[in-house]
A protein has these predicted regions:
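Conserved beta-strand-loop-alpha-helix junction that forms the acyl-donor binding cleft
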Residues: 122-132, 149-154, 301-311, 328-331
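Conserved acetyl-CoA-binding loop of GNAT-fold acetyltransferases
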Residues: 136-146, 297, 316-325
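Conserved acetyl-CoA-binding loop-helix of GNAT-fold acetyltransferases
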Residues: 96-110, 132-137, 268-271, 277-290, ...
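Acetyl-CoA-dependent GNAT
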Residues: 37-94, 104, 110, 166-168, ...
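Conserved N-terminal entry element of GNAT/NAT acetyltransferase domains
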Residues: 1-15, 32, 161-187
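Active-site acidic-Proline motif in GNAT/NAT acetyltransferases
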Residues: 91-93, 126-127, 272-274, 278, ...
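Conserved GNAT acetyl-CoA-binding A-motif
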Residues: 113-123, 292-303
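Terminal substrate-recognition subdomain of acyl/acetyltransferases
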Residues: 155-177, 316-317, 321, 326-331
Length: 331
């Protein structure tokens, strides 16, 4: 999963996040609200195994603000259509700023829209009135109170409050028409196939001697969506997908003079013609940079046609610099 809205990002936890999760989970001040004032006492090795386990029913997510990790979320299926979620803002300097409600809303919207979920549940401790206020403001409905249902780390009996949310109950704390970015799902293949020809057509007009109007190979799209280390990030307003960025992790080739680097390659960036000029290209580039950083890339690389001045200006504004020039001689 990869979601981006404003300065906030929700992304899959990766192996490189194990040490950070270990620090948070072993911190009693972070875990006290969950009933573990002494921390979990876990290890980086155990967390690495959990993240690596494809059979683990818990989907672990990292929360970022301005590309800085600030906390974590998770969700797991109780049944095919019901997801249980949890959230912790772990860095104290990012707490009580209203970020939690936005992040919960981002995740709930995504689960309802693109993951087949029709019901979301969560619980919190009875004394956590602030969390209850946040949940109820987002549309969650209290479904019950379980008195003295578990003992915390100190042996104290605790009472839990249960909540549920249905799609029609979700109250977004932001304008639902604001542009945002999410990672593509298999069901998005058709819209991606429809946008691709607009990119190829524009490129063919710039360099018709080398590029022609065409459709993209559906197998290429499917592999990028489903294979690890690859992604298609979609720019969306409301329910309408308006553009995408295709990115994958790779490595410098094994050539003796090359300094070895893991890096991300932005293969394609496309925005529908009618939606251009509204900042969607910038939004996608920023999301791709965040994706690349999270995946351990040392840098993000892309190519541009030499006469595509609009694209070149965009890339330079976003911090890209020229590295290699390709020369071609007609024979």
């Amino acid at each position: 999963m990869y979601l981006a809205l404003h300065k906030l990002t929700i992304r899959d936890a990766l192996l490189a996040d194990a040490s950070l999760l270990c620090k948070w989970w072993n911190d009693g001040t972070v875990m006290a609200h969950a009933g573990f004032p002494q921390g979990l006492g876990t290890s980086v090795e155990k967390i690495t195994q959990q993240i690596s386990d494809s059979n683990d029913p818990t989907h672990r997510l990292i929360l970022e603000c301005q590309n800085t990790p600030i906390g974590e979320m998770c969700y797991r299926h109780q049944d095919p259509n019901t997801a249980e979620i949890g959230i912790k803002i772990c860095e104290s300097n990012w707490q009580e700023q209203g970020l939690g409600s936005q992040l919960i809303a981002m995740l709930c919207r995504e689960l309802f829209a693109n993951h087949g979920i029709t019901r979301i549940v969560l619980d919190t401790m009875l004394e956590n009135h602030r969390a209850q206020h946040v949940y109820e403001k987002l549309g969650f409905v209290k479904t019950g109170i379980r008195e003295n249902c578990w003992r915390d780390q100190t042996g104290k009996l605790r009472t839990a409050v249960d909540y549920q949310l249905l799609p029609q109950q979700l109250c977004l704390p932001f304008d639902e028409e604001e542009p945002w970015v999410r990672d593509a799902q298999p069901a998005d293949q058709t819209i991606i196939e429809e946008i691709y020809p607009t990119l190829f057509e524009a490129m063919s007009q710039l360099q018709p001697q080398y590029i022609q109007a065409a459709k993209q190979n559906p197998d290429f799209i499917r592999k990028i969506i489903t294979e690890n280390g690859k992604d298609i990030l979609l720019a969306q307003c409301g329910e309408q997908v308006l553009g995408f960025g295709v990115v994958l992790m790779t490595h410098t080739p094994p050539y003796n003079c090359f300094v070895p680097h893991p890096y991300a390659d932005l293969l394609d960036l496309a925005v529908l013609p009618a939606a251009r000029g509204n900042g969607l290209g910038t939004l996608l580039l920023q999301a791709v940079k965040g994706w690349a950083k999270a995946h351990g890339a040392d840098y993000l690389e892309l190519g541009a046609l030499s006469n595509n001045q609009g694209a070149i200006r965009l890339y330079e504004r976003e911090g890209f610099g020229e590295c290699i020039k390709t020369f071609r001689a007609s024979l």
